[in-house]
UniProtKB/Swiss-Prot annotation:
Keywords: Ribonucleoprotein, Ribosomal protein, RNA-binding, rRNA-binding. It comes from the Bacteria. One of its GO terms (cellular component) is ribosome. Pfam families: Ribosomal_L4. It comes from Wolbachia pipientis wMel. GO terms for biological process: translation. InterPro entries: Ribosomal_uL4, Ribosomal_uL4-like, Ribosomal_uL4_dom_sf. Residues 49-76 are annotated as: Disordered. Gene3D superfamilies: 3.40.1370.10. One of its GO terms (molecular function) is rRNA binding. Part of the 50S ribosomal subunit. Belongs to the universal ribosomal protein uL4 family. The gene is rplD. One of the primary rRNA binding proteins, this protein initially binds near the 5'-end of the 23S rRNA. It is important during the early stages of 50S assembly. It makes multiple contacts with different domains of the 23S rRNA in the assembled 50S subunit and ribosome. Forms part of the polypeptide exit tunnel. This is Large ribosomal subunit protein uL4.
Length: 204
C-alpha cells in the first residue's frame, strides 16, 4: 500500500509504504467499544466514598429500651434510617481497572488505524523537524489540512510541543503512547515515517 508523503506545510515530498496488516484490518467495531471502555475505566480515579454506619460520628448507645415504648426497636442512632446516619451500600474507594487481552488491544489499534485510513483521515509526514515556535505559526501549518482536529504522532521537540499546546484541536503524542481512544477522538491522524516503523515492530 502506497500513499503520499507530505510535510507540515502539506507539500508532497515523496511516497510512503503502508503495511496492509496494519492499515487494512477487518473492521470489528465491538472490539473498539471494548477497548475504549477499558481505557476509560483505567483513567477513573476511584476516589468516591460515602460514610457507612461505622464511619459517621455519633453515640454507640442504644437510644431507648427494647420494650415498653411502643416504638420500633432501634439499636443505634447511626443507622441509615436516622438523620445523620450512615449510608448503606454506598461507593467506596476502589480501582475500576480490569484486564484486557494484549492480542485484543493490538487488534483494536489495527482496526482504529484501518478505519481512519479507509476514511482518508491518515496523513503520513516525513518528519516533525520544522522551525515552529509560536502558536500562530502552528495554526498556519495546520490550516493547510482540511480537518477539524489532529492527532500528531512522532518524536517531536519542545518547541513544537509549546507551539501546539494552546490549540485545543491539536494533540501531540509519542509513538509509544498511540492508543485507540485518542485515534477515534480526533478526525485526522498524522504519523511520521519513524512512527510507521515503530508500529510494525509493536503490532506485527
Amino acid at each position: 500500500m502506497e500513499c503520499n508523503l507530505v510535510n507540515l506545510s502539506n507539500d508532497n515530498v515523496g511516497a510512503a509504504q503502508l503495511n496492509p496488516l496494519i492499515f487494512s484490518a477487518k473492521q470489528k467495531l465491538s472490539i473498539l467499544h471494548d477497548i475504549v471502555r477499558w481505557q476509560l475505566a483505567k483513567r477513573r480515579a476511584g476516589t468516591h466514598k460515602t460514610k457507612g454506619i461505622s464511619d459517621v460520628s455519633g453515640t454507640t448507645a442504644k437510644p431507648y429500651g427494647q420494650k415498653r415504648t411502643g416504638r420500633a426497636r432501634q439499636g443505634s442512632l447511626r443507622s441509615p434510617q436516622f438523620r445523620g446516619g450512615g449510608i448503606i451500600f454506598g461507593p467506596v474507594v476502589r480501582s475500576h481497572t480490569y484486564s484486557l487481552n494484549k492480542k485484543v488491544r493490538k487488534f483494536g489499534l489495527k482496526i482504529a488505524l484501518s478505519l481512519k485510513y479507509l476514511n482518508n483521515q491518515v496523513i503520513i509526514l516525513d518528519n516533525l523537524n520544522i522551525d515552529v515556535k509560536k502558536t500562530s505559526e502552528m495554526c498556519k501549518c495546520i490550516k493547510n489540512f482540511k480537518f477539524s482536529s489532529f492527532l500528531i504522532v512522532g518524536d517531536y521537540g519542545d518547541d513544537l510541543l509549546r507551539a501546539a499546546k494552546n490549540l485545543h484541536y491539536v494533540d501531540l503524542i509519542k509513538p509509544i503512547g498511540l492508543n485507540v481512544f485518542d485515534i477515534l477522538n480526533h478526525e485526522c491522524v498524522m504519523l511520521t515515517k519513524d512512527t510507521l516503523k515503530h508500529l510494525e515492530g509493536r503490532l506485527l
